[in-house]
C-alpha cells in the first residue's frame, strides 16, 4: 500500500501573491509595515497557521491562549511591565525574608 505525503510544498503552491492573499492580509494587520517587511515568507506562513489553529480551537469551544502577536501592542506592553513588577516584588520579598548580615 502506497503512502501519500500530506506535506505542503510551499514553493510550488498555486496561491495568489502574498500581497493579495486574504490569509496574509489577516496576519499583516498585527505587524507594523517595517516588521512585516523583515519577516521571511516562512515566518509569515507560520503566523498564518498559528492564527488558524487558534481560531479552530476556539471555534470548537476549547480554551486557548491568544498568541502574543495577536494581542494589542498596549496589552503586550502592560503584560511585560506587570511581569517585571512581579519579578522585582518577589526579589524584594526574598531580601526581606533573608536579610544580609
UniProtKB/Swiss-Prot annotation:
**Biased segments, Basic and acidic residues type:** 87-101
The subcellular location is:
Nucleus
Keywords of this entry: Nucleus, Transcription, Transcription regulation
Q: Which ranges carry the KRAB-related domain? A: 19-83
InterPro entries reported in the protein's UniProt record: aKRAB (IPR003655), KRAB (IPR001909), KRAB_dom_sf (IPR036051)
Cited SMART domains: KRAB (SM00349)
UniProt tissue specificity? Specifically expressed in testis (at protein level). Not detected in other tissues tested (at protein level).
Q: Does the keyword Transcription regulation apply?
A: yes
Main location (coarse class): nucleus
Region (Disordered) residue ranges read 73-101
Any one GO biological process: regulation of DNA-templated transcription
- Coiled-coil positions: none
What's a single GO CC term here? nucleus
Q: Which family does it belong to?
A: Belongs to the SSX family.
- Quote the function comment for this protein: Could act as a modulator of transcription.
Protein's name in the database: Protein SSXA1
Amino acid at each position: 500500500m502506497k503512502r501519500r505525503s500530506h506535506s505542503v510544498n510551499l514553493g510550488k503552491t498555486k496561491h495568489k501573491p502574498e500581497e493579495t492573499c486574504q490569509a496574509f492580509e489577516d496576519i499583516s494587520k498585527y505587524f507594523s509595515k517595517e516588521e512585516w517587511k523583515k519577516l521571511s515568507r516562512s515566518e509569515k506562513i507560520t503566523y498564518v497557521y498559528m492564527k488558524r489553529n487558534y481560531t479552530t480551537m476556539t471555534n470548537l469551544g476549547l480554551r486557548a491562549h491568544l498568541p502574543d502577536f495577536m494581542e494589542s501592542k498596549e496589552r503586550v506592553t502592560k503584560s511585560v511591565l506587570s511581569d517585571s513588577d512581579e519579578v522585582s516584588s518577589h526579589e524584594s520579598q526574598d531580601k526581606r525574608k533573608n536579610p544580609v548580615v
